[in-house]
Structures are given as C-alpha cells and as structure tokens.
C-alpha cells in the first residue's frame, strides 16, 4: 500500500537501517504484551491528522489502536515573541501544559505508568519542555523528535530572540543547557532519539532563505536537530515533515521503542474501514471571518459535511452521498463506514468559508483523525474560474527529488529543495477532471466555480 517510488523507498529504508546500526540504537524494548501508549505531538500550525499514516503503520505491526493518541492543540501556531500574548497563538508554556494534560488523560485511560512521546518539529519543543520542566521525566519512557529545530531555525544574536525557534533565545538556551558533566542536552532517565535529514530540511539550513533573510548565515546546520546524549538518526533526502511521517522515520521509531525492526512499513488493509474526525476552521474564532485566516484546530459547529465515493479515473462523484451531516458543537463527524480503498471527496460548507472540496486516495484502514478544514478564498483568487490546490500535508514537494505531475505538467512555482508543500492552479472553462500525482500516488478531483465560492484540494496521503 506504500504510495512511494520503490527506488526511493528502498533507499530511505537502507539509509535508516544503516545509520541506526552504526548508532547502536536498538534499545531494550517492551514485550508485545505490554506495548506502551504512544502520544503523537504535531508541529507548528499542524493537526493530529498528520499522524494518520504513522498510526496505521504502528497498527499494521500489532500496536493496539487504543494505545495510539494524537493530540490536537487548539491554537497550533507559536507566538512571534513567546513572552507576549498574541491572539490565536500558543506560548511554549501553554503548549507544554496542554501536552501534560493529554499525557495525564492517556495514562489514566490506559493504566500505563509511562508513555512514548513522538513529536514533529515544534511538537518536539513541547516534549522537551514537558520532560525537563513539567514532570515528564517521570511519565515518559522514550522521546522521539523528528525535525525539531533543537538549536533553532536561526541562531543569530539579536535577531528575534523572543521566538522559541531562536537558538540564541532563552527558551532553547534553557533546554540545551548541559544536564551533566558529559554535557548532555537531554533529560534522563528518558531515552531520546532525534531524526533529521542530511541536508533537505528547510528549517535546518545555513542560509536564511526560508526565514526571509537570504544571504544571511543562520548559524544553524543540517545537524541542528541533533541533541548531545540522544541517539541521532540521519536519513538522506527526507524533508522536514518526512522526519516523522515517512516510512523510514517510522521504522527508526519502531526499532528505537521495541529494540527490533518492524515486520513491515506497508500499511495493512482492513476489510471494514470506518473513518471519523473533526471539522475545523480558521482564525481566532472560526465562526468569525474577521478574526483571521490562520490555522486553528477549533471545532466549526454548524458546518455542513458531505462525503462521496468518487471515480478513480475522473474524480466525479459515484452515486449519492455516503454521509450528509451537520457538524455539532464539538466539531466531530462520523464514524462513517466507507468502501475500502475507494477514493473519496469531502465537501464542507460553512458561513464565512468557501465550500471546500477535498479529494483523497482511498483509506486502507480505519482512522478517527480524518480532520477537515473549511478554507477561505484568497482575494487574489476571487476572480478565477476555479482554484485547485495540490497539497501534501505529510511532506514537501521537491522537483529535484520527486516525480510529480499536476494537471498533466510538473507543478509550477515549486522550488527545488523541499521548500513547499502545495501548488495551486486556476483552470479555465467548464467543470472537468484535475489530477495530482506524486511518487506513485494519484488523486483526482473535479473543478468547481470559484465565483460561486468553491475551492478544490487534491490532498496526497503519502
């Protein structure tokens, strides 16, 4: 079921295995009868939904679904200055407090004494803060950080040092202070692992291009995510998000926790697939468009959701809606039993938002974190005939690395170096099919008129 080129998959797996063998990172793991709960912590501006494929891979290797928990931070974006309140943003302390509360819930629900924490990017900041400053050294057995900017996205004295991403700022300097005579940067007795790219993580670059400071040295290298005292894994060519969501990153995490390689990184199919999730919006208040267009993970009550099976070749709807529902106060929808492997279209309509059409590949397995966001049309797009976005939430698009087509041609405006996770086109003419292809995965949808308030997203799963 892996929707990724065979050549690249084998290269990533071989690289991860080789690096892990050299690092000697096979830790003493639990028995199959006592697999620990895993709490997944998403990155900046992201959602629990990004952990969907990772959870599937753990389940495919025998991990109980009820012992896999992905948190969903209500306001997932960091503050520009961590010391100053900012509407719709979460401070490092608030982030840590939310994680602590979620860990407590998981411990109570499972009866376990400790959890494994697995975080991507900013999620690793919260994990480190919780273990060092929030009592997590007593409740966490393993901490796995993918692409976390542990020494900053930049480390420029005097430059935005109030940000939690500043390597010279008080937040990261406090976390990185030596913990023992050896100078370890990690807090014991927790076992730590970091996963990074060799040079393809946009937030671990020596030049300030991605922070709007092209030509300025960041004083950060590709090794920035590593921590002294941790097992540090390097996987060639993966991007910032793939440090957590790629099959190779999963394999590294599984072996670190259990002491043995996973039986498979492919996702096992279920005979009966049931999906559910949450519908969210944008801004400080998703019901008030005037409060901003930035991401949140707050429920969007009153939104109308329709789900359709679609034709794999054309993206056209196949028959009547599988689900037509009004979202309740908690934002939750489902569970909905869907045809295993059948591609789907999700259509969300809500006041103040565009009617958002999301086309996705078929679901091989059940998931309760199929979260959906109602988007808004950008001012620059309001006169377009239609607006279609190819998006890859669990990784970036890299024309120097990946095989991609968007509406039959390579995506326009996507730079080499895994710096973008989406591409947009504005097709003219009547309704028609549009396809997005990425390393073997193909998602097909239909155009819808932007003038009538519609947006289309072709969302890649892998």
Language-model-detected regions and their locations in the chain:
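Bacterial N-terminal signal peptides that target proteins for export
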Residues: 2-14
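C-terminal motif of bacterial Sec signal peptides marking the signal peptidase cleavage site
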Residues: 21-24
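Helical cap/lid subdomain of alpha/beta-hydrolase-fold lipid enzymes
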Residues: 47-49, 83-88, 92-113, 125, ...
